[in-house]
Amino acid sequence: MKRRSFLTTVAAAATTAVAPQALTRDWKTPVRYPDPDIKVLDPRFEKYRLGNTPIQRLYTGTLWAEGPCWFGDGRFLLWSDIPNNRIMRWLADTGEVSVFRQPANNTNGHTRDWQGRLISCEHGTRRVTRTEHNGRITVLADSYQGTSLNSPNDVVVHPDDGGVWFTDPSYGSLRNYAGNKGELHLKESVYRIDAQSGQTEKVTDEIGKPNGLCFSPD
């Protein structure tokens, strides 16, 4: 057999041996961009969608996941597991999930202030708190004009003046599942905590069961 014919025969045999393995390999479904599960309901928001961003499942096992808050400087995500009375943390670099705080007073919404401190709405204690950099908890609001709040739900910091806006519906006080069942003495409202004086003022009580808050960049 000539050398060229021998090499051709060997190459063909190797291809035949490898081909079945390649054909039976368990190929994963390729990622499609943009992710088909990310849908834009209002065309005005199309420009905010990142075309190469897929939806990922970070964790399972919570009873009611709420209030995600991203810490870009620490590369971790916090969120509330309200009925389990805990705050969870996901580390971006390792994917590890652990308990950040428990008990957490049935915390719901979270945000960060201009100094990077965590601000939280607590159903169980009917208050809005701030976690200082040393871990100490500061109460920002637990009443309005001397009357206990209902169950602060969501919170956001105003981009212009640093005021802390929060909603106060009744959800966390209706039953013990998401807080502590109790009487309601205030009309469900949206409030603002002044960044300078710390005083709480009512913004409106004309929104039925106010919940999520967000300010547009402009």
Regions found by a protein language model. Give the residues of each.
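Twin-arginine (Tat) signal peptide motif
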Residues: 1-7
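Sequence-structural signature of mature extracellular/luminal beta-sheet repeat domains
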Residues: 7, 14, 23-218
